[in-house]
A protein has these predicted regions:
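Metal-dependent amide/peptide-bond hydrolase catalytic core
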Residues: 1-180
């Protein structure tokens, strides 16, 4: 008999993922010993956490400030509000607000306590040392070449990722304006 299993291990940093992989391998070795079976392992692939680059972030922000913010139509505001009413959102619409009190106060005021359907404002420049969870190959790229990231509004405030609401918003003027 033969059996195969695929484990996908996720952690915030490459170093933590390597440690967790070693632990999972030991667990598999223990299971093989208990069942008197043979074990072979093969590493297939991995992704890296993004390396932050303050200089690039500052340059992107400097240019972002010069671009006019999107102006949404009444229909887009109504659509965003209708979508926002289909999911529960807790807290303020900004990861940075969770880690910085000044940002939290800014976002609270700009979003009327998180009630606004769209974030129609530019956040102050914020550099975070916190690695946010997510699936992206931007981390891999950042280990090879200078890389910076910006976030822009392409969906209603606090829309859950990987949701039908996110997909629905992706074909609207809200998303298109946010990307331009």
């Amino acid at each position: 008999s033969k059996a195969k299993v695929l484990y996908m291990i996720r952690e915030a940093t490459v170093q933590d993922a390597v440690k967790l992989e070693a632990r999972v391998d030991k667990i598999a070795q223990g299971a093989a010993l208990m069942t008197e079976t043979q074990l072979s392992t093969r590493f297939i692939d991995g992704t890296a956490n993004p390396l932050p680059l303050k200089t690039m972030e500052q340059l992107l922000y400097k240019n972002f400030v010069q671009v006019a913010l999107p102006e949404y139509t009444e229909e887009e505001w109504a659509y965003a509000a209708a979508l926002k009413n289909t999911y529960e959102s807790a807290g303020l619409p900004s990861y940075a607000a969770k880690f910085d009190e000044d940002i939290a106060q800014f976002v609270d005021k700009a979003t009327d306590g998180g009630k606004r359907a769209l974030n129609d404002f530019l956040m102050p420049l914020y550099h975070s040392s916190v690695t946010l969870p997510g699936s992206t190959d931007v981390g891999d790229v950042s280990w090879q070449t200078p890389t910076g990231q910006i976030n822009c509004v392409t969906a209603p405030s606090m829309v859950p990722g990987h949701s039908w609401q996110m997909v629905s918003a992706g074909t609207t003027g809200i998303a298109h304006k946010g990307m331009l």
